[in-house]
Amino acid sequence: MSKLSLALTNTTLGIPVTRLISPWLLDLGGFHGLTLFEMGLAMVAFGFVFALPLTTPPRVKWIGPLDIVSYLLIAIGFGAIAVALSLGRIYWWFEAPWLGMLFALAVICLTLAVIVELHRDSPLIDIRWLTSPATLHFAGAILLMRIVLAEQTVGASNFFQALGIQNEQTMPLYAVILCAILAGGLTCALLLRPGRENWFYGTALACVALGAWLDSGATSLTRPHDIRLSQALVAYGSGLFLPAAMAQGMGGVITRGPIFILSFITVFLFTQSIGGLLGSALFGSFITLRTAFHFNVLAERSEERRVG
């Protein structure tokens, strides 16, 4: 359990680490230097994959021709949703017709994938298990939690971007966030045991709620050092949430057999990736609307003063 907690914690460190090192890389070589560094990290990771191979698991001939069809339909559906959610607030939802086409394509592809899987004797993904009340409850809970956690990655960064605060000024804040995530992961590694997942969910949600409440009083005078405590609480909650969710889900799947592992991975990846993008789209769109509203109010007041 401790190894799983630490491994999942490492997957959440990307954003704070990026915020810490990207200002220096941008100063050295601009976006070219930043992307070059990313390519270097990918090559190093690629080398480690071959230098430190995992133990080969037992292999069973399982993949069939229809599995490829189902996989392609699911991949296209998820990909279309991801692209639309990522670019919706940039091109704006009602201004770009192709965003609606992407959502329609996603619905068609995922519907076809469900139809194919329901009529197979050995499905790639067990749709009936995915639509069971227990699975829907689990998926809905972690999806909502993932949407809430997007407040930190989008809300705080876009807020300071709207205020004109540079990346260098937010580096101490993201250092605090990084330490809080690590603290959450270490807490899970030390205390998380089967049957304790709900306590971790409750603690994570309480931390996020308290942090969001503290941030609700932010104004145009708020600076990064003013929200270190609140963002640390949100980060600590995110560090508690992911290992507990994976531990609870995997524990139930392993008892049912290895056939359900792929179905669980599909649910987990969907809720985490699509949930994160959905949260970013919701918070980003809200910030865009409120920013435009306040700009219009300021423009009207300026015009009234000029006329008066």
Q: Model features per residue range: what roles?
A:
Residues 50-63, 83-170:
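Membrane-helix boundary/linker segments in multi-pass transporters
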Residues 3, 34-37, 101, 170, ...:
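Alpha-helical transmembrane segments of multi-pass secondary-active solute transporters
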Residues 123-293:
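12-transmembrane solute porter fold
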Residues 305-307:
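Conserved small/polar residues in nucleotide/adenosyl-binding loops
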